[in-house]
Amino acid sequence: MGKVVGIDLGTTNSVIAVMEGGKPTVIPNAEGFRTTASVVAYTKSGDKLVGQIARRQAVINPENTFYSVKRFIGRKQNEISQEIRQTSYNVKTSGSSIKIACPALDKDFAPEEISAQVLRKLVEDASTYLGETVTQAVITVPAYFNDSQRQATKDAGKIAGLDVLRIINEPTAAPLSYGLDKQNNETILVFDLGGGTFDVSVLEVGDGVFEVLSTSGDTHLGGDDFDQQIVEWLIKDFKQNEGIDLAKDRQALQRLTEAAEKAKIELSNLTQTEINLPFITATQDGPKHLEKTVTRGKFEELCSNLIDKCSIPVNNALKDAKLEASSIDEVVLVGGSTRIPAIQQMVKRLIGKDPNQSVNPDEVVAIGAAVQAGVLAGEVKDILLLDVTPLSLGVETLGGVMTKIIPRNTTIPTKKSEVFSTAVDNQPNVEIQVLQGERELTKDNKSLGTFRLDGIMPAPRGVPQIEVTFDIDANGILSVKAKEKATGKEQSITISGASTLPKDDVERMVKEAEENFDTDQKRRKNIDTKNQAESLCYQAEKQIKEFEDKISQDLKTKIEELITELRSSLEKEEYENIESISQRLQNSLMDIGKMAAQAESKNTNTKDDGTVIDTDFSEAK
């Protein structure tokens, strides 16, 4: 088995790590950073950008720059009304599925495809770092992700060319790195507030066993929502003062979003900061500028409802674990949004102790995923991870009621069965609707899928015995089987249909990704070639100027002609010519070095004219 990596596929940033020498190590990306922005963009010329380079050009290309896509993965139209308002790109629906419009390519992407581009970037950079091709991974998801979102994450990995060995919960991964050396039993509360999701898990950790006691969360709450509070405040204030609604301007909205995120980050260390956005818009009277001072107090006031919402899953997780706050030994903070002072104060108030600050909240999840990857690869011994299912699972029964078969916070993998019967006499079949959620009625829970069991023997209602078995694997992905005991007839469903992508679409996307791999690599190579050539032209002009009096006129003319020829090929994007001309220019620059060295040597020899200066030296006393 080759190297198995651990990946934290985040809303804002993503991280990849691996076990090296028995220790988990974060792998830097090609740009040298330990985190990679979860941003994908397409330029007008069709070039794909991933990571920080994509984020940097978002203001000038808002409709083709896709960020926070994790908030849409595995979701249906009726689940994203809040998130749609926060993007500068166009999110639309195709049936019940979500699509992201890319005007630059005149194409629609599934969220899984965009996430796959981020995964591909992480894996390619890791393969270069490790010197071997990475094909297997453990990927983390928020603990409160439902079955659809988990399956969609797995699909994204598949589209990226990965064999996803395990999907594990983010707040479960975090203690794997934190508690690796713990010998004594401790009860840990993991508070995981990321860019787009929020989870709280309570675990028992000690002697290599990591047992999740409970988990709770909110997949509609994260750092993006804190940014949005600032954005809406700025829009409202600008409209009152200038009479202009910036919400209708995509470019202005993107600038506001970036400025809000920057202000939020700065207010974690400062008590106030300035937001200055010159030329935010223009009218007939001329350009308009936005200048605003934001204090930490104002930020906390704007976000007070979000901060209050964070306390609910904490209380729920403690209640489900049947623990008091005083029973918690350690609080581990995960996710960049936990740097907000008001969040840290709220956690301290609820639990009664200072959070543990020894872990890097941006990296701890990926490090934990790498530990789990090491377990699966056989590199790490004596570690046992006992995770739970975050939401109850059941079926619809008579009257539109959800009957729970597996309660939330059940340790996985698990398998449970219940026996049901028919509702009317001589009923030939039953339709089984699989549900996930905590509400009592079917309509208030999420439907994961429906299947039908035919061939039931004619009998009075209540006589046939239909055994429904729920089986959850270690990834938290569900399969359901129904069996009529009298006839032995059975029908089953693996809830992969819960993914927003049909199997055919996933396979098509995998094929497209493979087919486009060479094209993408060629584009990347062309961009690198172009950048190197432009740099070479600059260096050549600089050297001609610097050594003008030390090189021959013929060499100077030759280099100037090569620069002109190279710039012409750059303009026409003739990449083969660019490479050959660059090589010739490089050779000529070496000639400059030789001539300059010869000229320098000649000057040194000329200065030594053999004259002897007659003088006396006195002896040093």
From Swiss-Prot:
This is Chaperone protein dnaK. One of its GO terms (cellular component) is chloroplast. Residues 598-621 are annotated as: Disordered. The keyword Chloroplast applies. Belongs to the heat shock protein 70 family. It comes from Pyropia haitanensis. It is found in: Plastid, Chloroplast. Keywords: ATP-binding, Chaperone, Chloroplast, Nucleotide-binding, Plastid. It holds the Pfam family HSP70. HAMAP family: DnaK. One of its GO terms (molecular function) is ATP binding. It comes from the Eukaryota. Acts as a chaperone. Its main location: plastid. The gene is dnaK.
